[in-house]
Amino acid sequence: MPRPKKWRKVCCLPESNLFGPLTPHYRDREIIMMTVEEYEAVRLIDLEGMNQEECAEKMNVARTTAQRIYNDAKKKIADALVNGKIIKIEGGDYKLCSDSEPMYECGGCRRHSCGT
């Protein structure tokens, strides 16, 4: 019997889910798939300035899981930057924190704090 899925908590979806080179033949480029929880780990650690422990707490996962998710995301970003590939963000095992969730539970990201 497989283990039940543990949903990762994500504050908000990216405003755009496709990133890559702006060349005329960009559609011919290889696409790297990044999950929403990988995007969230990068957002929390690199943009919000959290450490892995704080990121893990926000995402409702173990620190080792947050570290693995973050490292996977960094490898994908580096591959896309160095090799001119496209990153597409979609899928994963996540649940969005809702706007109705109390702020003490969500903590609120910059987007929610700024009302965007």
From Swiss-Prot:
A Pfam family that this protein carries is DUF134
Gene3D superfamilies hit by this protein: Winged helix-like DNA-binding domain superfamily/Winged helix DNA-binding domain
Family statement drawn from the similarity comment of this UniProt entry: Belongs to the UPF0251 family.
Q: What is this protein called?
A: UPF0251 protein Amet_1463
Q: Which organism is it from?
A: Alkaliphilus metalliredigens (strain QYMF)
